[in-house]
Amino acid sequence: MSAAEPFFATRLPRLVMFDLDGTLVDSVPDLTAAVDSMLASFGRPPAGIEKVRQWIGNGARVLVRRALAGSIEHDGIGEEETEAALALFMEAYADSHALTEVYPGVVDTLKWLKRNGVEMALITNKPERFVAPLLDEMKLGRYFRWIIGGDTLPQQKPDPAALLFVMKMAGIEPEDALFVGDSRNDVLAAKAAGVRCAALTYGYNHGRPIAEEAPTLVIDNLRDLLPCADQAAEIVLPDDSLSPSDQRDQAVAVSKLWMKVIKALARWRWRA
């Protein structure tokens, strides 16, 4: 049963939590290189980028098991083989993130949210040891007050533990938070935490359209969350060279634009 629920009908969310791979960055090329390097060590043929794209989303261990199985189903893979392959994969992936790219619209969106006082957190199933170096290389780390990796807590998404932990640390209730992701795990974690979820169409969802997971909102670009949603338009951020009074005037103008978008989003409904 569906129930009508406004999508931040009167104000900005106080906290926005983001997934990483498939949401903020396209890391498939580097992950594929590491997977194929691991498979080569076992004398196996490369998996290739399209298969790896469908296997991502449940952490490094599951990715490695899927690569060994050559399928999204991996029940037949033993623990000893998994441990050996995981060590090779981790070593290969630690070498470089040269092929990873930030998706269009991400930096504009993070800048806008930060300038407007919205707290941000990163919650990913990627092992913690890889997260900080990647964020530094992509110049994204500065935007997040809280960063939770796949082994920071005992649980990973779709378990809501990381979302609940961040909200507790921030002192923010679920109705004042938003989760942005790209996969079934992200949507399930958000729903379990009682948080609205915006899901991106371009990410990694095992080859399935993200709309099938029934998030609160489906978007094609992270900039769709902003007042200036026209992809051809440049988002104008507050100018640091302006006087304090002019900056306040500019912030008020941007906030008025955002309120129009929020009222439009109030038409979206939760889907059971």
UniProtKB/Swiss-Prot annotation:
Gene Ontology cellular-component terms listed: cytosol
GO molecular function, one term: metal ion binding
Pathway(s) annotated for this protein in UniProt: Organic acid metabolism; glycolate biosynthesis; glycolate from 2-phosphoglycolate: step 1/1
Family to which the UniProt record says this protein belongs: Belongs to the HAD-like hydrolase superfamily. CbbY/CbbZ/Gph/YieH family.
Domain of life from the UniProt record: Bacteria
Disulfide bonds: none
Entry keywords, A to Z: Carbohydrate metabolism, Hydrolase, Magnesium, Metal-binding
Cofactor(s), names only, from the UniProt record: Mg(2+)
PANTHER family reported in the protein's UniProt record: PHOSPHOGLYCOLATE PHOSPHATASE
Annotated InterPro entries: HAD-like_hydrolase_sf, HAD-like_sf, HAD-SF_hydro_IA, HAD_2, HAD_sf, PGP-like_dom2, PGPase_prok
Xref: CDD domains: HAD_PGPase
Record GO biological process: carbohydrate metabolic process; DNA repair; glycolate biosynthetic process
Gene3D superfamilies named among the record's database cross-references: HAD superfamily/HAD-like (3.40.50.1000), Putative phosphatase, domain 2 (1.10.150.240)
Substrates-to-products reaction catalysed: 2-phosphoglycolate + H2O = glycolate + phosphate
Pfam families: HAD_2
SUPFAM superfamilies the UniProt entry points to: HAD-like
Binding positions (Mg(2+)): 19, 21, 182
Organism field: Pseudomonas aeruginosa (strain ATCC 15692 / DSM 22644 / CIP 104116 / JCM 14847 / LMG 12228 / 1C / PRS 101 / PAO1)
Identification of the protein by name: Phosphoglycolate phosphatase 1
UniProt EC number: 3.1.3.18
